[in-house]
Amino acid sequence: MKFKIYTDGACSGNPGPGGWGAVILDQENNQKNISGNEKNTTNNRMELLAAIMALKKIKSNSDIVIYTDSIYVKNGITEWMVKWKKNGWKTANKKQVKNKDLWIKLDELRKKNNVVWKWVRGHSTNKYNNLADELATQAINN
């Protein structure tokens, strides 16, 4: 199966109450919206959780394109993670990688599929990214 996933995270304060949202489209363009929240979190944790929860909804061995407006998520999974693992989950500055627990989960889930990561500009003309943002923002208060 082929899927497109649009993800977003939001936080009211950083840290503070946060929400995540994702729009999952299958190859026939059937749409599933998912969202959730945490009481005390950060925007980066919500961005990561949006991708994690979306990937959990998809069967293994699928072709997936994930669209995120988070440079942190895109660069983390496509560039930085290889170095972090080699350095024992430490950054180039020898500090512990923030959100290591979520990075590990995301890495495990993406390995079960063929995932391509794409960055999209937030708050622009992409209706599915805007919907993911809306889901994340609404989830903060639920």
Predicted regions and their residues:
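Hydrophobic (often cysteine-bearing) scaffold residues that line and stabilize catalytic clefts
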Residues: 46-47, 128
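RNase H catalytic domain
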Residues: 10-17, 52-131, 135, 140
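RNase H-like nuclease fold core
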Residues: 1-45, 53-58, 133-142
